[in-house]
From Swiss-Prot:
Stated name of the protein: Methionine import ATP-binding protein MetN 1
Topological relation to the membrane, as annotated: Peripheral membrane protein
Cellular component terms (Gene Ontology): Gram-negative-bacterium-type cell wall; plasma membrane
Name of the gene this protein is made from: metN1
Principal EC category: translocase
Length: 343
């Protein structure tokens, strides 16, 4: 549905040249929810704005629904953009218009008959859970409700693609979850292709089928969500995954933690489990094989793309030789083990 090929975008600021995107290629199949994640300044917003040519690429090809957009005339591009809805971090609602009026605006600009506008807007407000807010004004809505209005407006022209530019960044966690569930529901009901950009791996984890990691204007990793979470190939992807699972060392352990082993001290380990290592009884196996005892201090488990992954803090009791052998065995079985210190 969306195919970006060898996209390069260069900005000129006086005598300074800024390369925002460098030879980026991305394919989003029809009906998928595809996430692009990266830090601030990585090129995410420039990338998504190239899809509907709000930013015209310096080089490269942009195809949406099989149509090459970069060669279209202005009138042809305007028509093509009706098939591409877009929502933003800031809702951009017209304060002087009601909820109904905001959603109706693109239809009015397209000279849609009034009866058709009424039917379509009513249908969309019901879809986004605002069927009772027809006559409300944006000032009387919560942030989540405003974003729902923006989503309804973006869907007014019955697009095949929805672009989401940091659509949940300005929302609290509970509202973020509700908006993500709404997007997932719309994707299922309408078969809508969704491309979203974010700096939060939690967003990707909750609703995306595939994810690409962008850094310094380049896509450095892209795959299914389950594959990236199970086998991240780049340090940046690993960092984003770690941000979704975070365990603090308890204060009493922190006070006793030493950088080097002492008499009768034991290593404190941080273990990351992904893919098959989550379900395997690996700690029990280390106890049998290496005569070590694992005291679990804290643990957290989650799902992404249908795959479980988790993190654990443990004390490993045993001789130095036994614990080193056990740690090496765990690493051989795809557990990432970090020695945090000794307690």
């Amino acid at each position: 549905m969306i195919k970006l090929s060898n996209i390069t975008k260069v900005f000129q600021q006086g005598a300074r040249t800024i390369q925002a995107l460098n030879n980026v290629s991305l394919h989003v199949p029809a009906g998928q929810i595809y996430g692009v994640i990266g830090a601030s300044g990585a090129g995410k917003s420039t990338l998504i704005r190239c899809v509907n040519l709000l930013e015209r690429p310096t080089e490269g090809s942009v195809q949406v629904g099989g149509q090459e957009l970069t060669t279209l005339s202005e009138s042809e591009l305007t028509k093509a953009r009706r098939q591409i809805g877009m929502i933003f971090q800031h809702f951009n609602l017209l304060s002087s218009r009601t909820v109904f009026g905001n959603v109706a605006l693109p239809l009015e600009l397209d000279n849609t008959p009034k009866e058709e506008i009424k039917r379509r807007v009513t249908e969309l407000l019901d879809l986004v859970g605002l069927g009772d807010k027809h006559d409300s004004y944006p000032a009387n809505l919560s942030g989540g409700q405003k974003q729902r209005v923006a989503i309804a407006r973006a869907l007014a022209s019955n697009p095949k693609v929805l672009l989401c530019d940091e659509a949940t960044s300005a929302l609290d966690p509970a509202t973020t979850r509700s908006i993500l569930e709404l997007l997932k529901d719309i994707n299922r009901r309408l078969g809508l292709t969704i491309l979203l950009i974010t700096h939060e791996m939690d967003v990707v984890k909750r609703i995306c089928d595939c994810v690409a990691v962008i850094s310094n204007g380049e896509l450095i990793e892209q795959d299914t969500v389950s594959e990236v979470f199970s086998h991240p190939k780049t340090p940046l992807a690993q960092k984003f995954i770690q941000s979704t699972l975070h365990l603090d060392i308890p204060e009493d352990y922190q006070a006793r933690l030493k950088a080097s082993p002492e008499t009768d001290s034991v290593p404190m380990l941080r273990m990351e489990f992904t893919g098959q290592s989550v379900d395997a009884p690996l700690l029990s196996e280390t106890a049998r094989r290496f005569n070590v005892n694992n005291n679990i201090i804290s643990a957290q488990m989650d799902y992404a793309g249908g795959v479980k992954f988790g993190i654990m803090l443990t004390e490993m009791h045993g001789t130095q030789e036994e614990t080193q052998a056990a740690i090496a065995w765990l690493q051989d079985h795809h557990v990432k083990v970090e020695v945090l210190g000794y307690v």
